[in-house]
A protein has these predicted regions:
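Short beta-strand and adjoining strand-loop segment in the mid-core
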Residues: 98-107, 112, 137-155
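Rossmann-like NAD(P)-binding element
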Residues: 34, 40-84, 90-97
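Short, glycine-/small-residue-rich phosphate/pyrophosphate-handling segment
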Residues: 105-129, 136-137
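Short beta->alpha connector loops
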Residues: 65-69, 129-131, 153-155
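Active-site-lining helix/loop region of Rossmann-like oxidoreductase modules
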Residues: 145-209
Length: 209
């Protein structure tokens, strides 16, 4: 499958390593190709880098910072129409320092804002509840754990779930429509606190039935 990664931070680089190893063709969208290529983690990646507005793919994974998510999707534009867009972002607000708060919560979510801005895209919330290394290598959390998926389009959730299984996830809990993204994003302030106590980001939740 051709997969477009939207964003070039640590999460984008993690997916850029993992997905080609699974046989996927990966193209990476960035605001500035030359600047991105000059960074050591991308200079020898072997991946195609293109401006956001030239990015097209069968499936997209959005991995920008939360404040860059809406502008990034706006730049990609109509190429998103009809495509599954996995949203791995969180609406973190660092304006008052650390720990961050959420720029949106309770009655709305960043994912829902993205879906409203791009009604023809098939938004799926997934991967935002774990660190980048755990996203692509679930055993890095130290034990079997749970990944969550939410979205308004059932077939889009199924496509995202299939990709997660390719990455090694076996326990994937479907939470239904995109309003569930509110809770998934609201987990992150607690995740940040736990990270501070453990001193490492490789941990996760396990839903025991």
């Amino acid at each position: 499958m051709q997969i477009g990664i939207i964003g070039t931070g640590p999460v984008g680089r993690a997916f850029g390593r993992a997905l080609p190893a699974l046989g996927h063709q990966v193209v990476v969208g960035t605001r500035d190709v030359a600047q991105t290529r000059s960074r050591p983690e991308w200079s020898d990646s072997g991946l195609e880098l293109v401006p956001y507005n030239d990015l097209s793919s069968e499936l997209f994974i959005l991995v920008t910072g939360g404040d860059g998510a809406l502008p990034a999707l706006a730049a990609v534009g109509p190429a998103l129409d009809g495509r599954v867009v996995i949203d791995a972002t969180n609406p973190l607000d660092f304006s008052r320092g650390f720990p961050p708060s959420l720029s949106v919560c309770n009655t709305d979510s960043l994912s829902e804002q993205l879906q409203r801005a791009h009604p023809d895209a098939r938004l799926v919330k997934m991967f935002n509840t774990v660190a980048n290394e755990v996203m692509i290598n679930p055993p890095a959390a130290g034990a079997d754990s749970t990944l969550f998926v939410a979205g308004n389009d059932e077939s889009a959730r199924a496509a995202a779930t299939e990709l997660a299984r390719e990455l090694g996830w076996s326990d994937i809990l479907d939470l239904g429509d995109l309003t569930a993204a509110r809770g998934l994003e609201m987990w992150i302030p607690l995740w940040v606190r736990i990270y501070g106590q453990l001193g490492k980001p490789e941990f996760n939740l396990k839903i025991v039935r």
